[in-house]
Each structure stands twice: as C-alpha cells, then as structure tokens.
Swiss-Prot record:
Belongs to the TRAFAC class TrmE-Era-EngA-EngB-Septin-like GTPase superfamily. EngA (Der) GTPase family. Keywords: GTP-binding, Nucleotide-binding, Repeat, Ribosome biogenesis. Residues 353-437 form the KH-like domain. The keyword Repeat applies. Residues 4-169, 177-352 form the EngA-type G domain. GO terms for molecular function: ATP hydrolysis activity; GTP binding; ribosome binding. NCBIfam families: GTPase_EngA, small_GTP. GTPase that plays an essential role in the late steps of ribosome biogenesis. This is GTPase Der.
Length: 439
C-alpha cells in the first residue's frame, strides 16, 4: 500500500524547513557509510495516529539564498502541486500577509488539490496577532496557527492533515508486478514506456483508474500481470520546465514509493550524473528492486572496450547499487527492449526469494570459520544464528551477543556472502542485528 504525499510550500523564510524537521523529528532515514547516497534530504517518512505519509520540503529544493525570486518559489509550488496529495501552505504571522502569499494562494486555488493554510510563528494562542486574521483574505479557509520552532499547535495541524489525506489507493493483486520508470528529464522514459506497451503479446488493460492511478497502465504478458507507473505521464500534465532537474526528484519519489521494481534510465551520451545518483538513492533506501537501463546506446561510438569501460564507470559511480543488473538499450530503435521485462521477471523472483534458516546458517557458518568476526574493544563477538524474516526486499536478522560491537563492514561481508551463494540480483538486502533473546 502506497503512502500519500504531503508537500510544504510557501515563500522563503516562513519556516518550511523548521516545520518539516519538527514533524519528522528523528524519522528521517539516512543511510550511513554508503558512498553516493545523497544526504541533502528533501523528503521523509512521517506518521501520525497510525497513518503514514511522505512529507516533502520544497524549501530544500533551492538552497541558493542569492536567488530568492518569485519565479523560483513558483517552480517549487508547481512541483509540489504536481506530486502531492495535500499541500501545507505556510505563511508568516510576524511579517503578515504579503503579495507573494497572495500569488501563491492564487495558484493553489486554481488546482484541485487539498490545501491547509498554516500560519507559522504564532508564539501564543492566548492573543492572536492582528496579522493572523488578514490571512482569511486568501480564500483558503481558516488558518491553523502554529509555532514550528517550539512545537505549538503541531498536534492540531497533524490531526487536520490526517483528516484531509485521501483514502488509501486501491491495492492490486499480490502477484501484480508494479514497475516504475525513473530517471532525469529527457532520458527517454516516454519512449521506453511506449516500446514496452507496444511489444508483441503485451495486452494493455482499458480499466480506468482513480485520479491518482490515472498514470498507471495495467497490462499482461504471457499470463503475468504488470502495472507500469508512468512518470512520463505525470510530466505530460506538468507546466514545469523539464530543464529544472532538481524538481524532477518529486516525480521520481512518487513513482518509487508505489513500485516494486524501478527501471533507472541513464543517458548513454552523458553517463551517470549526480541526479541519477540521487534518484537511485531514493529507490535503494526504499528497498526497491532496481534495474539500470543505459538508453541511447545506438548513438554511442563504440570499440571493443566500450561496453566494459561503460559498465565499470556505472559500477564506480553507482557503487551502492552494485547488485543492479545493467541493460544497454535503445528505446528509439527497440534494441534489447525485449530483455527489459525478462529482467523484471528475474528480479521479481529474487525480490520474493526465501532462504531456509538451516541453509542460510550452513553458508554463513562456513564463511565465519574462514573469516571470524573480529573482537571489538577486547570483547569477543559471537554470532549465534541468522534467519530471513521478510521479502520485498529480502530482510535478515542476525542474532549476536553484543549487537553494538558488530562493525558494519562485517555485516557487509555477510551480505556479500549471502549474495554469492543465493543470488538476489537486482534487489537490496536488509540486515539487522539483535541480541539473542530479543523479539
């Protein structure tokens, strides 16, 4: 089940990032010790009253304080409107109503999105500042007063957020593979989608979806059901310039959240970019299957070493997803497109694979005999056993005497051992450690 997306918008310096951090507290997931995974977080997983949602901070999209002009604010709002289910429009009670607030409100009123007007920097509810009442003029309902810096009113705001969130999406059948095509603008996502749907034996369903599902295309091939989450379809509805790459992560995030397997498209003429790394990092952190598609391979000048050199470059720049298979394709000519769904099927099998506890421990015990876990601070580390506790992605728990002493590098060694013996190509592996006797 996918989570709704809530975007915080507003002009600069009204407290968007402060509100973002206040709601998330320590919930932001940052992967440590993995080179290439960005840490400049613009989104986080939030929860209130047992309802989970994604929170997006548009304030983090343009960190350049020298370029605070309304055109940038407008792009932030448009990006949020495009991807979000609910908008938190933040205004500043101390500064009062300003023309930029009215411009943003005009844009929001023209949309069909739910909007909550949030009046920040209200330090006391006993006596509202006179400026508070001016915000009623925006025509977006009664403002909710808060102080993001001290937490005043945050609970009431989140109560309202939960009331306004859309009902959960319709769930597809368990065996339906949800595929997201992700990547930077103009990398060929639309062409790939059209190629896949135009393949022989692909039957596209004509079942209409909900508003949010309108960009989903159900189809079958050889008796297997798929859902193609078409981020290119979102783009066609957008007024956002495709040259504004920093905003494309919102589109990718919405698709990644709902997918099982992500097709990360890279432009062969440019190679992996920082933006590719960021999008890949989102997919990795969300535990999705990943296949790297190097598109426009037909126009790359090649010699006998080109394939090898290009593969090595991708592995170096996207080292944290070294498990992902790489396909060199051309969406324009159809080169190797037939391999895409074949690889999706293989990754799906790996995504759902289970290893018996007995077999898993036989392999790990043999590896630990050859390379025992090093002691830490003079204290020996004992690994008792491991077991697989979940799939999609494959998730393992290792029971030890002192979990905090087991270095991440040894956990990485155990992960590599699992991969060498059991495969899991195309999927991340999640490993946690627990003290024996813990639930």
């Amino acid at each position: 089940m996918s989570r709704a997306m809530v975007a915080i918008v507003g002009r600069p310096n009204v407290g968007k990032s402060t509100l973002f951090n206040r709601i998330l507290k320590r919930r932001i997931s940052i992967v440590e010790d993995i080179p290439g995974v960005t840490r400049d977080r613009i989104y986080g997983n939030a929860e209130w009253l047992n309802r989970k949602f994604i929170l997006v901070d548009t304030g983090g999209l343009d960190p350049d304080p020298k370029d605070v002009i309304f055109s940038k604010v407008k792009l932030q709002v448009e990006a949020a409107i495009e991807a979000a289910d609910l908008i938190l429009f933040v205004v500043d009670a101390r500064e009062g109503l300003v023309p930029e607030d009215e411009e943003i409100a005009n844009m929001l009123r023209k949309t069909k999105k739910e909007v909550i007007l949030v009046c920040n920097k209200v330090d006391s509810f006993k006596e509202m500042p006179a400026s508070f009442y001016d915000f009623f003029k925006l025509g977006l309902g009664e403002p909710i007063p808060i102080s993001a810096s001290n937490g005043l009113g945050i609970g009431e705001l989140l109560d309202e957020v939960i009331k306004r969130l859309p009902e959960n999406d319709v769930e597809y059948e368990e065996e339906t593979i949800k595929i997201a095509v992700i990547g930077r603008p103009n990398v060929g996502k639309s062409s790939l989608v059209n190629r896949i749907l135009g393949e022989e034996r692909v039957i596209v369903s004509d079942i209409p979806g909900t508003t949010r599902d309108a960009i989903d295309t159900p189809f079958t091939k050889d008796g297997r059901n798929y859902i193609l989450i078409d981020t290119a379809g979102i783009r066609r509805k957008s007024r956002i310039s495709e040259s504004i790459e920093r905003y494309s992560v919102l589109r990718a995030l919405a698709a990644i959240e709902r997918a099982d397997i992500c097709l990360l498209m890279i432009d062969a003429t440019e190679g992996p970019t920082e933006q590719d790394t960021k999008i890949a990092g989102y997919a990795f952190e969300n535990g999705k299957g990943i296949i790297i598609l190097v598109n426009k391979w037909d126009i790359v000048e090649k010699d006998s070493n080109t394939y090898k050199e290009y593969t090595e470059m991708i592995r170096e720049k996207l080292a944290f997803i070294s498990f992902a298979p790489i396909l060199f394709i051309s969406a324009k000519t159809g080169q190797r497109i037939h391999k895409v769904l074949e690889t999706v099927d293989k990754v799906w099998e790996e995504y759902n694979k289970r290893i018996t506890t007995g077999l898993l421990n036989n392999v790990l015990n043999e590896a630990m005999l050859m390379f025992p876990p090093p002691s830490s601070k003079g204290r020996p580390i004992k690994i008792y056993y491991a077991t697989q506790v979940g799939t999609k992605p494959p998730t393992f728990v290792i029971f030890v005497n002192e979990p905090e002493l087991l270095h991440f590098s040894y956990v990485r060694f155990l992960e590599n051992t699992i991969r060498q013996n059991f495969g899991f190509e195309g999927v991340p592996i999640v490993i946690s450690t627990k003290k024996r006797g813990e639930d």
